Design a protein with these regions (language model features):
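Structured alpha/beta or helical-core interaction and ligand-binding surfaces enriched in interleaved
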Residues: 1-126
Length: 126
């Protein structure tokens, strides 16, 4: 699952058993919330301290996603539910720019690039 929210971009997949290293079987009850920007995970933790505050942000240098949280799938489901309930805007990119400020300018530009790419996909269908 890819998730773009005002706090950042996350790729969420089933965690692997044990220490989560490659080659281990997946753990269907636990997910890895992966990010390319550490501050995105920190913002998510700050938004949901009661759910994610106790989770350590682990660094995996050289990995596709360098920063990760490991959480029970049920906790992640609650985070996503609350994110959905908190939608209070009519333009995601503009709301994200307001939330991120100058520090998040690169993320907002990346959102525009994703938007343009998906617009191209739509145009191929028309």
């Amino acid at each position: 699952m890819w998730l773009f929210v005002r706090e950042g971009f996350f790729s969420v997949v089933c965690a692997r058993q044990g220490d989560g290293k490659r080659g281990r079987p997946i753990d269907p009850e636990r997910v890895m919330v992966r990010a390319r920007v550490r501050a995105h995970l920190e913002a998510l933790q700050a938004r949901f301290p009661e759910l994610l505050g106790g989770c350590e942000i682990r660094e995996f240098p050289g990995a596709d996603y360098a920063w990760r949280l490991f959480v029970p799938k049920s906790v992640w489901a609650e985070v996503v539910r609350r994110l959905a309930e908190d939608i209070d805007y009519d333009n995601f990119k503009a709301a994200t720019a307001r939330r991120q400020g100058l520090d998040g300018a690169a993320y907002v530009e990346a959102l525009h690039a994703v938007w343009r790419t998906m617009l191209g996909l739509q145009r191929q269908q028309l």
